[in-house]
Design a protein with these regions (language model features):
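C-terminal accessory module of base-excision DNA glycosylases/AP lyases that mediates lesion recognition
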Residues: 1-50, 117-128, 145-222
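Domain-scale selection of a single, long terminal region
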Residues: 1-102, 106
Length: 222
């Protein structure tokens, strides 16, 4: 019961704790050096995906979905940003990390040839499968999921299962270690919402994926 109570408190933070995002550059590499503050992680997820939801056509959703570029209105000004999952950056040792722009562009070009298939998609799972089939080298599982989410939002689809990858898998492992997820479930590619304990049931599958990664450092403390 104590673990469930702690988890419930962390879930509440997903909707109530302010989220601050620093962007040294905009989506086009121009110096920006600005902090953005959102009401919560849940609010940021909705605000960022709202850009893709309102794009004029599927091709623009594919191109922007792969490039991770999005526009957001903040303090009465519009900014074009790039999602940090696909940003290129130098780590503490000076090594270049992230996804190169040439990889993102190649993925967008390749996926554009599958526009007809995407138009015929009937679910997030369909979109995810199509995006994955167009994978280019350097465009990893997290980028595949992110692109599928962005394109699916435009098409009106949402995942019904929780996809595990990178930090999301780490968050799931912490819940598993506390007996809040079935044994070895963190090794699966996807989990059903019903696999998760009651405190997380107020999250949909997309939010829960986001929560597991964003709050993994809190989950380890349960």
């Amino acid at each position: 019961m104590e673990n469930l109570s702690k988890l419930e408190s962390i879930v509440e933070l997903y909707f109530s704790k302010k989220y601050k995002l620093y962007k040294p550059q905009d989506a086009n590499g121009e110096d920006l050096g600005k902090w953005f503050e959102f009401e919560s992680r849940a609010h940021f997820l909705d605000a960022y995906l709202n850009y893709y939801r309102n794009l004029p056509n599927l091709k623009s959703a594919i191109v922007n979905g792969c490039s991770a570029k999005f526009k957001i209105l903040y303090e009465s000004q519009e900014y074009e940003l790039k999602h940090n999952h696909q940003e290129e950056f130098k780590d503490e040792k000076g090594n270049l990390r992230g996804v190169n722009n040439s990889v993102l562009s190649s993925m967008a070009v390749k996926l554009t040839f599958k526009t007809t298939q995407l138009e015929a998609a009937e679910s997030f799972d369909d979109v995810y499968r199509i995006v994955k089939s167009a994978k280019v080298s350097g465009f990893g599982e997290l980028s595949i999921y992110d692109a599928a989410i962005r394109i699916s939002v435009f098409l009106g689809f949402k995942p019904t299962k929780v996809f595990l990858h990178a930090g999301t898998r780490v968050g799931a492992k912490y819940l598993e270690d506390k007996g809040l997820l079935p044994e070895d479930s963190s090794q699966e590619d996807t989990l059903e919402l019903s696999d998760f304990p009651e405190p997380t049931q107020k999250l949909d599958a997309m939010q829960l994926e986001n929560f597991l990664c964003s709050f993994k450092n809190d989950l380890i403390k349960i």
